[in-house]
Regions:
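Residue-level signal for inorganic ion chemistry
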Residues: 9, 91, 119
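A structural signal for short hydrophobic beta-strand segments in well-ordered beta-sheet cores
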Residues: 45-48
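Glycine-rich beta->alpha junctions and the first turn(s) of the following alpha-helix
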Residues: 100-216
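A short, Trp-centered hydrophobic/proline-enriched beta-strand micro-motif
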Residues: 23-31
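N-terminal glycine-rich flavin-associated loop
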Residues: 1-11, 37-40
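Structural signature of FAD isoalloxazine-binding scaffolds in flavoprotein oxidoreductases
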Residues: 39-43, 124
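A short core secondary-structure module
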Residues: 53, 57-103, 136
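Short Gly/Pro-enriched turn/cap motifs at secondary-structure boundaries
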Residues: 35-38, 62-65, 80-82, 106-113
Length: 216
């Protein structure tokens, strides 16, 4: 949601934000790779332009709940000749397709919240719907989108229970505050406006996070 609100086109927002707000689709994050963990910009997951679609090959690791997700936002290398922090794009991929597979990573606790995610000649259309590009932000500038999203996540975490959700789960917010049938955000234009207002609130979250951390 935050990446689309900041970098998404109007068409991307109208297509994706309403079902996100209603809790109808679940996303996972495809950043880390087996050989690109702390040095994320060295990622090698390759995305080739094939005219009317993208062809993705590579692997991601530590993908939280990838086996239960509907979509994944992935950092891919679209220009192998560019410098390390450039030539990376931020792409949205449907998990339910040929060429995309997951393998849960079993932890010592016996639980498997993380997965390996594989892309083997995975085909992603240039547009998921008319005018709805698979790429978020500018081509080869996905690093900017990723940095913004990581910063946003840290601010939400630092705010703790005093954040936008007030300590509640996303499902509870969707059911009680938004509603799946007659929700307040059934109007997609209102979804976009509400998201933009939330972004304006981020500086306040940053201050709240600092105050909370000082008390720890």
């Amino acid at each position: 949601g935050p990446a689309l609100l900041k970098y998404g086109t109007h068409e991307q927002k109208l297509h994706f934000l309403p079902p996100i707000a209603r809790g109808e689709i679940r996303w996972c994050q495809g950043y880390s790779e087996p050989n690109a963990g702390s040095d994320l910009a060295s990622l090698q997951c390759k995305c080739e332009d094939k005219g009317d679609h993208w062809l993705i090959n590579g692997q991601k690791i530590w993908t939280s709940y990838a086996d239960e997700s509907d979509w994944i936002f992935v950092l891919v290398r679209t220009d192998p000749k560019a410098t390390k922090h450039t030539g990376i794009s931020f792409i949205l991929v449907d998990m339910d397709q040929k060429g995309v597979s997951t393998k849960p990573i079993k932890l010592i606790s016996g639980k498997s919240p993380f997965c390996e995610t594989f892309f083997d000649d995975a085909t992603t259309p240039k547009e998921h719907a008319p005018g709805v590009s698979a790429i978020v932000g500018e081509m080869n500038k996905g690093w900017d989108v990723a940095k913004y999203l990581l910063t946003h996540e840290r601010e939400m975490i630092s705010a703790g229970g005093g954040g936008l959700l007030g300590g509640r789960g996303m499902g509870e917010v969707a059911a009680n505050d938004i509603g799946l049938e007659n929700g307040k955000l059934s109007d997609p234009e209102l979804v976009i406006k509400s998201g933009e207002d939330a972004l304006d609130y981020v500086p306040d979250l940053r201050g709240a996070g600092r105050r909370l951390c000082r008390r720890c």
